[in-house]
Amino acid sequence: MKVTVNGVEYSFALNSFAPTYTYEVIMGEPFSGATTRNIHVMMFATLLASNPDEWKMTLAQFTEWLYDHPAEEQTMASAISDEFIRRAELSLKKKKE
């Protein structure tokens, strides 16, 4: 999917492990989704991993931007949730086979 931040369109791709790996480098722990902070850092990690040459915002700048853009925050949070639900369902399906 695409996300527009400060008038620039960026890819927001959760179809690889790159966002998760980037999250783990930033946070020093696996993603749990248990806190708003976890989710916001995953959003940042996804944008950074999806746009390695274009993304220039710091995490602090991004969280300030998020505060003023709740609709975009919700869209990205839903995409993250949907992807982790999809992964969990695939894992359960594999266990049943």
Regions from the language model: what does each represent?
Residues M1-E9, F17-A34, N51-E97:
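Charged interaction scaffolds used for protein-protein
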Residues I39-A49:
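Short, hydrophobic/amphipathic alpha-helical patches that form generic packing surfaces
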